[in-house]
Each structure stands twice: as C-alpha cells, then as structure tokens.
Amino acid sequence: MTFKELNITEPILKAIEEKGYTVPTPIQEKAIPVALAKKDILGCAQTGTGKTASFAIPIIQHLHLNKGEGKRSEIKALILTPTRELALQISECIEDYSKYTRIRHGVIFGGVNQRPQVDMLHKGIDILVATPGRLLDLMNQGHIRLDNIQYFVLDEADRMLDMGFIHDIKRILPKLPKEKQTLFFSATMPDTIIALTNSLLKNPVKIYVTPKSSTVDSIKQLVYFVEKKEKSLLLISILQKSEDRSVLIFSRTKHNADKIVKILGKAGIGSQAIHGNKSQAARQSALGNFKSGKTRVMVATDIASRGIDINELPLVINYDLPDVPETYVHRIGRTGRAGNAGTALTFCSQEERKLINDIQKLTGKKLNRADFAI
C-alpha cells in the first residue's frame, strides 16, 4: 500500500513525497481512508506510530477540496492536545503537508504572550491546534468561536486526563457544533476514557495499533522476583553499582514516582520525577536535565514519559509492572535505539507474576531470571 493508493490529492501527495515518505505506517493505512470517508474514529495508538499524519492529512485534504475563493478563513478544524511540545509538533506536521495548498493554520498554547496568537487568529485560519487552557482563555475573551467546526481531534486523551484537563475539555465540548467529524486518539483506554468516547463519538470505527514486539528482540531483558517491600533496596543497590549514564525508571502511579525520588535522595542518589501533577515548566526542566545528562536518573509514569525521546538510553527499570503488556513493550523500547545496546530490568512482586506471563505471551520471549542479594 502506498500513499497514492489512499486517494490523497496531488498537492498533499507532493508534500508527503518531499518528506521522503511513500508507504504509510499501519495506523495511517487504517485511519486515513476512514477519516476521508468522514467517519468518527476511536484510535488506540502510542506516539511514534505516525498518528499525527493519520488525522492531519485527511483534514487538510477535506479543507483543501472545499476551500472557497477569496473568503477570509474561519476555523473549521480544532485539534486539542495536552502540551505545548505536542501542539508544536502537530503544527509542524500540518505545515509540512499543507505547503502546496491554501490552507492556513495556527497554534496556541499557554506560558507565552497571547498577543501574537490573537493577531494570528484575527487574520483568519482554517485549522487551529490548541492546548485546552489557552483555548478557553481566548474563547472567554471573545477571540475564538467554534460554531463552524467541522473536524474535531482530541489527541492523547489519556494524557489530558492524567494532567487534569478533563474539566477544561467538558467546558469546550458544548461549544462545538453537534454535526462534526470527531477523531479521538489515546494510547490507553481506561474506564474514564471509554465513558468520554461514548458521549462524544457517533458509531466510531475502532482502530488499534499495538507496538511491534519485535523491537524488543535486541534488548537484554531480566526479571527480578522480589518482595514489594524489597524493591527500593534492590533499586538502590543496582543504581550504586551501575555505570550507566542515563537510567529511566517506570512507576505505575504519580504518588509512587515521587516516593521513589525521595527514597533515592536519602541514599544519596539524585533523581527527578516526571508525571501529570507536575507543571509544564517543571516537566520541561526535568526533561532538559535528563537529556543533557545533568540528571542521571529519571522516574516517570507511562503517560508523562511520552515526551522522553533519547537515542542513548542504556538502562530502563520497571519498578512496577504495567497492567497492559503492550505498555511493557513501549517502555523498554526506549532503550537499545539507533543500534545502541540496551538493558531492561523488571522488578516483579508476588502479586505481579500474572503480568509477567502476559508479557511473555505477547513478546513470545521468556524473560530471564536475575538473582540478587541485598
């Protein structure tokens, strides 16, 4: 399957080919035809799957084919995303694929002067990429109306909830027209997300794309069977002996991530936590410190960790096991990138043993047991 076979129009196809892409990713192959057919989508996909293009390309195409001559642009598509970084990434993607069309787009987010954003809105745009807080601010000030929205994208919905944006979203939704196409994407599907999709989507086409388990084959994987109360001692012991420059530790909850940082601090090991309760500035600062090597150890929840993209990450530690085996694959896929060696260590308590079996079923690989003495 090629992009040409997905019935993408010439100006957009030209832009895609200029970027060096000819074959769509699995989610693009599944989602683009559905979105072009104007059906609602419930997409379950991680970042790094080509998800952004799977909603950006159909929206650009619809708007391009229906663009009136000489009329001032008004917002026809709204893309809501949780963070400034994601908003900018989506904006760049739209910029790339719409370059040979007359589609105008803009991006708004908090933490910066709103004046340039307001000026851009007043000039007229077709597609708006926004974070919930800044969108509500500018709506309340009368700078944005959502009456003409035909396409609505809610991206990284689980991360939105994790960061406490659910109330903002519930204030935005009633301002949207009833008749619109909704494209909803989330990496995980907890009950709160399912409840939201039930109220938002009309007969959606469900699209699931799981991470390739083959990507874990090159990573050395070991499991430590350990009592829950011994996990912190084991972690300290490993970090004190390890010479790895960067270590990423996964915790299932925000509370536990903070607790791990405190425990390590008492043992003289500096670390930082990144999760949804941290402010955007704090998350950015922690990420910057980790990427630059200023912070050696990062403790993260699954949702917050999506902003971490480092080629040289030699060691990943699963302090808690994830409930979903695909998440394990996604976690350990952070190491062993770009031909570098990678190791993934997993701490498994008695009550987590079933989860290990689920992981081994998914990957088709038995995890080697590691022995230890604390």
Write out the residue ranges for each language-model feature.
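Conserved helicase RecA-like core
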Residues: T2-I374
